Structure formats: C-alpha cells, structure tokens
C-alpha cells in the first residue's frame, strides 16, 4: 500500500466536484455573503475612519516621496524614479470601475486579490505593491491598502512636478475577492471573434463590461484585437472610457497626462515570462511573471510587450506628449517582443534610455495614443490642450481626481486634509442640513398626517422603496437622501410609474408644506425624510393590519437636492432595468430574472435572508410595478403577513408555466384545477431553489408571523438608510 493511500487526508473540505460542476446554471447566492465579519481580521469595534483621522498624512507622503527615487536592486526604477510605475498602479486600481453597475474601482483595494492581481494588464504591479509594503507595514491599520494605492499615485504625480486636484481617504479594505462579472471568456486576452465574445453586431460591447478583452483595464494598446488602426481604436477608447464616466475631454486628458510619465516594457518575447501570481509557486510569495529574459528586470523587463517612452522628460510633467504627437509623422513598427507600436519618422533621438544615460531613442507611441490625433473629436481637444498647457494641466488634475474617487460615493465619505473644497456635479451633491430636525413627537404627528391623506399602504411603501432602492453598495451612489425621485430622470423612469408617483409626491409635498409653514423656530422636514417616513407609516399600518404593533426606526437628516445639483446623464445609469423586489423587468433578458434579483440584492448589500423576507413582504404590501398580481399570494393585500411563503409552499397548489419563455406561471388547486395564483420566476425561485426554500420555510411556518414582521422591518430599515453615511 502506497503512502498516499495510507494518508487519511487525500482530499480536503472544499475540494472535489462541486455543486456548480454538477449544476452550472444553479442560482448562485454566494455573492450575497461576501465581505462578512467572518473574513475580516479587524476587531469588531474597529472604525477605519477614526483610524485614518489619526494618521499623519504628511509623514506618509514624505515616506512616499523618498520611495520614489530609492531604486531597489530586486526591481530597479525606470529612469531612477518609480513615478511612472506607481501612476499606472493607481490608475489600474481605480480603472476597473464601470458605471453600469458601479462595480470595480479602487474602493476595497481589490487589486491585491484574484483575478485582478493576475490580469495580463496588471503585469509588474505585484512589484509596485511589494515596494509599498514597508510603508504599509509602518502605518498599519491607519491607512488601508485601498487608500495607499491611490495616495501613492498622487504622490508620484506630485514628485514629478504635477499639481494634483486633491486627495480623499476613506476607502475601507476588503479581505477577499469581489464576485464580479468580468466577462465569459475562458482565455486571457481572447479576441472578439472567440466563442464567448463580449461583442455582438458591429462591435457592440456587452453590458456591464467596460474593457475590450478579458484581463484588460480598458483597451488593447495595439488597437482592436491587435489591429494597429488608430481610428478604429478611437471607437474602443470612447466606448470604454464612457463606461467609466469619462467624456471625450476627460479621456484625452487622462491618456495624455498619464502617458507623460514613465514607459512601457517589451524587452523580449512574452514566452520568457512565467506564470501570474495566482499560478506561481509558493516560493514566489505572491509575486508572478518571473522572467528568464536577461536579468528579468530593469532594461530586460517584459510587461505589456510594448517598448514605448512617450516624452523626453519621463519623470517630469511637461507638454511633450502633445508636442511629439503633432510634430512627427509616424510609421508602424514592432517592439522587441513583436508588438505593434509606432516610431517617429526622420526624428532625432531625443528620448532618454531608462537605464543607460549615454543612450537616446526616437519618440514612440502606441496605436491608442495616435487615436488622439487621428480621431477628429479627439484631435480637436488634443490641439487645444497642446496650445494651452495650463488648461491641459487643469483638465488632467480634475480627470485624475474623478478617476481615483469616482467609486467613493458622496463627499461625506471623504477624509483628510487634502479634500478639495470645490463641490463637483459627478459627486451627486446634496445640501448640508441647515435647519433644526424633526423630533419624535413630530415623527408621530407626520405619520398620522400621511395616513390621513388616504394614500394606500401600497403607494407609501412603493414610493419609499423606489426612492431608497436606487442605492448601489458598489459605488455608494443612489439612495433616498436628496429625494431625487422627484427630479429628472428618476421621476420619469418606467419602473417608478410616473403618473402614480406624481400623485403620491403631490400629497406628500402638501403634508410637508403644512408642517413647515406651521413651524416658528425654523424646524423643517425635507421631502427626502418625509418619503422614508411615509414608507415607515405604511409598513407600521400593514403590520397593525396583521395584528402586530411595531415601530419602524427613523432617523431624520436627509436633505433635498435640486435639479441643478443632478447630472441627468450620470444619474440615468441608476435606472433599474430589473427589480425583482417589485417584480419588474424592463425588457426580456438572457440572464434569468432570479439571477437579476440576486444581483440587485447584492448591490443593496443584502444577505439571502434579508432578500427573502423583503420579497415576501413587498409582495403582500402590493409593491409590484403596474399593480401586477404576480406573486401576490394573499387575499389580504396591504397586510404585512407571511402569506407569500405559506401559500407558495402549500402542496395543494400545482405550478405550471404559461408563457413561452417560462417566465410566468399559474398555481392551480390540485383538487379542482382552479387558478389560485400567478407568479414569475422571481416568485417561484423561493420554492424551487433549495437554499431559498429553506429560508422560505422559516417564514412560512405557523409560528413565524411575528418574526417575519420583525425581520422585514429590520431589512426595510437597512435599505432606507443605506446612503446615510452620517449615521455610520
């Protein structure tokens, strides 16, 4: 018998064939249980914001400035300065952000984890983070990795003579990888013609993706699928940058500003490069891409395979990028690694070598750099920046700040002495509280006034949910604060039933005006607060209808934003194209409705039990869009009962699909054949999916009514306050 056979631990927990292997289409609830206290090593009472406030930011920056020019033998600095490397590191930390679902970005320091730490576009950034470890180690919990990565990018720019727009801390580290959809391809950098392509039609990029190939941050620098066509590349640039909230001017500023510094690396064939960090051996200690080409570092470094230095001052801020872009004609060539790039025709050798002061090179550019000259719209902006260096510097400073802070949410989350004073429209500004807030007696009186309007439980609950459920935990946007449900574009969204919404808002505005007009000490109630308060009144009334007295918690302090404080285009991405909590689908989608429900729940930071109790409660409260009866498994709507679960689990009912797409079902009495209920995939999943059924059984039990109400109120209150960072 072999020693292997004798070992009682040939296999360990978590290994072997998984449920996903057996049933690849099974609904995945794991995304609802990421980033819990179980994976967080910090003490339960640890408050990162308080820890950051104790940080000597000036001392950290001083250490970072020293690091920039302290070249390490194990990974030497190009041109004796790590600035270019650290700018790239910060850019790639933030640059995964996409507007469609708010996921990606610098917020949790996800560049430390798979898959991002091993993306082909992030080659050598493992070394950048390792260079930072002594500084992170020194300051410990007072600065997160997420904050340090962005701060280092800022300091890199400042150390090279650039004046940044500002810096805000406040990014709390995560301790495990996000579960984000980055595409369906099974091969790194798979071309668009592959079997799992993210493209359809005339190069239409799949939503929510914002990169052209698996493993890239934005675009292929050689051009679409490696085709060195600057005009075609401009299409990809415009699409991907727009999907991370950048317009043409911001895009040009970012590309030109970022490419003012440093160089790319393609000293030899990629075949010399070893496995990425997640595939490397234990002895590599989290590093990857070990190269056997020459020394494998310094002048022999292979990163992208491109060998380009854009400016004659790669460690200093200058206007050289545009000077070179427009001063030369360009001819196609290949890097030593065989990648398509461009070299200036008939040009003098004015570009310094990164490691040999006696050498000079001709200017070089990427295909995507030339897009800024040969795309008509980009060319116009580029020439303006070339002729107006101060305007270019300001545009880059602002675009860099937006890039690195876009996923942080409102300014109230910003920390530190370098937060810029200027309020920016993309931050979704909300006025500061400027009046005394309502007290408990006012809350009780306002609830009575709301109920006296004659608005139904369904109307009150639906409006409050519509206001609050725009929140996205991914980029901290949306939510009830600001009352933007009364403004364009939210007031006109189909999911919000504009005509019905207008009637509810008119009634609530009447209550608001009457209350505010009656005050003598300046006390006011905002409409944002009143919408949430009205929802609470509706929930309490529905619980009372079920025979249970309960008070929904309420904390005043929301304010009303104006239309001028609302970027209509930027707000449009928050429109729910699917909201299973309201049994709503704007269009038929390839993705099953139940998966879209889980996705929505994850953006709302809900757990599976919270998602379950909210769906069951919202159904019986009549919150469906269009007053749809699908999933309203009760004969007493407006009562906060556990009827949804009890009736769904009733074995006297037999369910059958009644639509060609298998997305609508009828529940018939097994004995008589009479139709009792209708439901959607989102409804029936709570009886079909084994884990969700287990949760439904908890709430569908005979003794569950009080627990159901209590849990519903807790989950409801959580959603109502997701954007109340002032309460955290």
Curated annotation (Swiss-Prot):
Keywords: Heme, Hydrogen peroxide, Iron, Metal-binding, Oxidoreductase, Peroxidase. Heme b binds at residue 259. Its EC number is 1.11.1.21. It holds the Pfam family peroxidase. It is an enzyme of class 1 (oxidoreductase). GO terms for biological process: cellular response to hydrogen peroxide; hydrogen peroxide catabolic process. Its cofactor is heme b. Belongs to the peroxidase family. Peroxidase/catalase subfamily. Homodimer or homotetramer. This is Catalase-peroxidase 1. It comes from Burkholderia cenocepacia (strain ATCC BAA-245 / DSM 16553 / LMG 16656 / NCTC 13227 / J2315 / CF5610). The gene is katG1.
């Amino acid at each position: 018998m072999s020693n292997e056979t004798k070992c009682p631990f040939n296999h360990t927990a978590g290994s072997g064939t998984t449920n996903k292997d057996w049933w690849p289409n099974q609904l995945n609830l794991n995304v609802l249980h990421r980033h819990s206290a179980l994976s967080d090593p910090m003490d339960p009472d640890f408050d990162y914001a308080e820890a950051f406030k104790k940080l000597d930011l000036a001392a950290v920056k001083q250490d970072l400035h020293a690091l920039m020019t302290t070249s390490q033998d194990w990974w030497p600095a190009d041109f004796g300065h790590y600035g270019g490397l650290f700018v790239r590191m910060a850019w790639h930390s933030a640059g995964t952000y996409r507007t469609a679902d708010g996921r990606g970005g610098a917020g949790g320091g996800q560049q430390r984890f798979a898959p991002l730490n091993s993306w082909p576009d992030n080659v050598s950034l493992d070394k950048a983070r390792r260079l930072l470890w002594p500084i992170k180690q020194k300051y410990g919990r007072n600065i997160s990795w997420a904050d340090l990565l962005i701060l280092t990018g800022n300091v890199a720019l400042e150390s090279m003579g650039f004046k940044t727009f500002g810096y805000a801390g406040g990014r709390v580290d995560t301790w495990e990888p996000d579960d984000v959809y980055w595409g369906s391809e099974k091969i790194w950098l798979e071309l668009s013609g592959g079997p799992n392509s993210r493209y359809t039609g005339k190069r239409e990029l799949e939503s929510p993706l914002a990169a052209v190939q698996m493993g890239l941050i934005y675009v292929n620098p050689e051009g679409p699928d490696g085709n060195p066509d600057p005009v075609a590349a401009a299409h990809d640039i415009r699409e991907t940058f727009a999907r991370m909230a950048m317009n043409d001017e911001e895009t040009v500023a970012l590309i030109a500003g970022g490419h003012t510094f440093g160089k790319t690396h393609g000293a030899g064939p990629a075949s010399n490069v070893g496995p990425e960090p997640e595939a490397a051996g234990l002895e590599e200690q989290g590093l990857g891409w070990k190269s056997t080409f020459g020394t494998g570092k310094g002048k022999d470094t292979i990163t992208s395979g491109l060998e380009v230095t854009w400016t004659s001052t790669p460690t200093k801020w200058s206007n050289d990028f545009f000077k070179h872009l427009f001063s030369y004609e360009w001819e196609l060539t290949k890097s030593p690694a065989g990648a398509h790039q461009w070299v200036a025709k008939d040009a003098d050798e004015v570009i310094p070598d990164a490691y040999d002061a006696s050498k000079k090179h001709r200017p070089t550019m990427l295909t995507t750099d030339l897009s800024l000259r040969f795309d008509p719209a980009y060319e116009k902006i580029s020439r303006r920046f070339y002729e107006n260096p101060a305007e270019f510097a300001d545009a880059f400073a602002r675009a860099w700040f937006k890039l690195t802070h876009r996923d942080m949410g409102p300014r109230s989350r910003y920390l530190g002495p370098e937060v810029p004073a200027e309020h920016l429209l993309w931050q979704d500004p909300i006025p500061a509280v400027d009046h005394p807030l309502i007290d408990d007696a006012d809350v009780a009186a306002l609830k009575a006034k709301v109920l006296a309007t004659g608005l139904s439980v369904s109307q009150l609950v639906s409006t409050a949910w519509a206001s609050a459920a725009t929140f996205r935990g991914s980029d901290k946007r949306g939510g009830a604060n600001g009352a933007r449900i009364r403004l364009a574009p939210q007031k006109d969204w189909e999911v919000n039933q504009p005509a019905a919404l207008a009637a509810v808002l008119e009634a609530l505005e009447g209550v608001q005006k009457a209350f505010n007009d009656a005050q003598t000490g300046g006390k006011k109630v905002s409409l944002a607060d009143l919408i949430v308060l009205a929802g609470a009144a509706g929930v309490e009334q529905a619980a009372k209808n079920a025979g249970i007295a309960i008070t929904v918690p309420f904390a005043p302090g929301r304010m009303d934003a104006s239309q001028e404080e609302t970027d209509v285009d930027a707000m449009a991405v928050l429109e729910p194209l699917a909201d299973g909590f309201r049994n709503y689908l704007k269009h038929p989608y390839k993705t099953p409705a139940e998966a879209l429900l889980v996705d929505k729940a994850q953006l709302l930071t809900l757990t599976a039990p919270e998602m379950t109790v909210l769906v069951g409660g919202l159904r019986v409260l009549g919150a469906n869009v269009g007053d749809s009866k699908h999933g309203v498994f009760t004969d007493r709507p407006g009562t906060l009962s556990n009827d949804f679960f009890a009736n769904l689990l009733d074995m006297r009912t037999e369910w059958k699909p009644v639509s060609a797409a298998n997305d609508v079902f009828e529940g018939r009495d097994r004995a008589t054949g009479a139709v009792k209920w209708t439901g959607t995939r989102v409804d029936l999943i709570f009886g079909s999916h084994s884990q969700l059924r287990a949760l439904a059984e908890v709430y569908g039990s005979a003794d569950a009514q009080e627990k159901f109400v209590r849990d519903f109120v807790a989950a409801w209150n959580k959603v109502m306050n997701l954007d109340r960072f002032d309460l955290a």
